[in-house]
């Protein structure tokens, strides 16, 4: 796997893990995309590059 592909995969995993943690602690409705991005140490724009909307994180969870 190329370095960029590896970094992209790791970033997506980091966003996903941060979202799951926030959903558990705060609830889905109370969690914003901005909070997920901050917890994952990425910009809000980067979050939306990986997930077009917050619900897409849950769809990703369902596919795993």
Model region roles, listed by residue range:
Residues 42-51:
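Short hydrophobic/aromatic patch on the recognition helix
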Residues 1-26, 30-42, 56-59:
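Basic, helix-initiating cap at the start of DNA-binding domains
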Residues 51, 55-64:
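Alpha-helical DNA-contacting segments of helix-turn-helix folds
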